[in-house]
């Protein structure tokens, strides 16, 4: 191969490698400026991405911004390959257009998913089944070919966020109802309408975990607002939301609601309650988050390490608890034996 062509080939390969590394750095690592501005920037990105996915109840991938033509040219380290750069610019432009179209469709499907979820929640509140034909009317015929994908995402959101499973009750008419996954269900329709009082609990515990095991009240409301749940506005499923999170779940010891120390004016925060610690774990919550994000727990490395430490501490605590129980039982038995012997006549 002539030397000039070899030089062009090497330059092109170098540009491609540089672009790939730059894009990886954009996605996986904060810049030096970002680190200086916020030492926990990577944790913040992780928290925001997971919270958004949790709120929408459907898997969402971090959106990668393709490198701009000017940035790619600046990193190319060549000044003579004008033809190659022109071709690269055309490819980049085509790639950006394709990405924009895909993102637009994804946003539209997300909106249709949220509309259908709200419709199904209304039907649930009214104790009415719905049909596939009605659901198609909600999303409009334009998105008919995407109905299977929308239906899957709707099912996932109602299941994960609201504790309601979408079940087909009549295959002939394609009729569906939302069934509580938390209440008793013996198969008849009346018990299927049981209100899932704690359906919001796992998402709330997840938000607290994502915020360093202690979430400010405004962070909780920000998350609830993304779900269409607002302070002072009665919700179709959960009723009065403030009462639910600051009284009901607190009285049931799933949540703790306390004033932030030294806050003036007073501000409040949420933590896991003792019952939440007893009935679930950070690993279970992380598995829930992973399911929402359609991934595995170890893809959240910082949270995964914390969850593993929590599992180890729990495993170490179990033998100590068992030992204490054994000691208590032995002491109690000894006391009973002593009491019995002392009561015998000499």
Curated annotation (Swiss-Prot):
Biased composition (Basic residues): 1-18
Keywords of this entry: Cytoplasm, Tumor antigen
Region Disordered, residue ranges: 1-107, 311-346
GO cellular component terms, A-Z: cytoplasm; nucleus
Localization (cell): Cytoplasm
Tissue localization of expression: Expressed in testis.
Coiled-coil blocks: none
Pfam families reported in the protein's UniProt record: MAGE, MAGE_N
Signal peptide boundaries: none
Domain MAGE: 109-307
First-listed, main subcellular location of the protein, grouped into a coarse class: cytoplasm
PANTHER family noted in UniProt: MELANOMA-ASSOCIATED ANTIGEN B4 (PTHR11736:SF162), MELANOMA-ASSOCIATED ANTIGEN MAGE ANTIGEN (PTHR11736)
Protein name (database record): Melanoma-associated antigen B4
């Amino acid at each position: 191969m002539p030397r000039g062509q070899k030089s062009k080939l090497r330059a092109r390969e170098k540009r491609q490698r540089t672009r790939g590394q730059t894009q990886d750095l954009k996605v996986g690592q904060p810049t030096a400026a970002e680190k200086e501005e916020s030492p926990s920037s990577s944790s913040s990105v992780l928290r925001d991405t997971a919270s958004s996915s949790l709120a929408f109840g459907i898997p969402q991938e971090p959106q990668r911004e393709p490198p701009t033509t000017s940035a790619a040219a600046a990193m190319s380290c060549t000044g003579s390959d004008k033809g190659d750069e022109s071709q690269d610019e055309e490819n980049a432009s085509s790639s950006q257009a394709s990405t924009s179209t895909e993102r637009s469709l994804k946003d539209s499907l997300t909106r249709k998913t949220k509309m259908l979820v709200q419709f199904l929640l209304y039907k649930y509140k009214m104790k009415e089944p719905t049909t596939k034909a009605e659901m198609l009317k909600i999303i409009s015929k334009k998105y008919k070919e995407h109905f299977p994908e929308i239906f899957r995402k709707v099912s996932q959101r109602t299941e994960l966020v609201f504790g309601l499973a979408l079940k087909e009750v009549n295959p002939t008419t394609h009729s569906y109802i939302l069934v509580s996954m938390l209440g008793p269900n013996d198969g008849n329709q009346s018990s299927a309408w049981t209100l899932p009082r704690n359906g919001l609990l796992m998402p709330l515990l997840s938000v607290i975990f994502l915020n360093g095991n202690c979430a400010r009240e405004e962070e909780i409301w920000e998350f609830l607002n993304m779900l269409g749940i607002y302070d002072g506005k009665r919700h179709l499923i959960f009723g009065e939301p403030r009462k639910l999170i600051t009284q009901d779940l607190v009285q049931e010891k799933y949540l703790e609601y306390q004033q932030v120390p030294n806050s003036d004016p007073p501000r409040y925060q949420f933590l896991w309650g003792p019952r939440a610690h007893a009935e679930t774990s950070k690993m279970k919550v992380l598995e829930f988050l992973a399911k929402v994000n359609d991934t595995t727990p170890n893809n959240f490395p910082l949270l995964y390490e914390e969850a593993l430490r929590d599992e180890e501490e729990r495993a170490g605590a179990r033998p100590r608890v068992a030992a204490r129980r054994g000691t208590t039982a032995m002491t109690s038995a000894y006391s009973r034996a002593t009491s019995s012997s002392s009561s015998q006549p000499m």
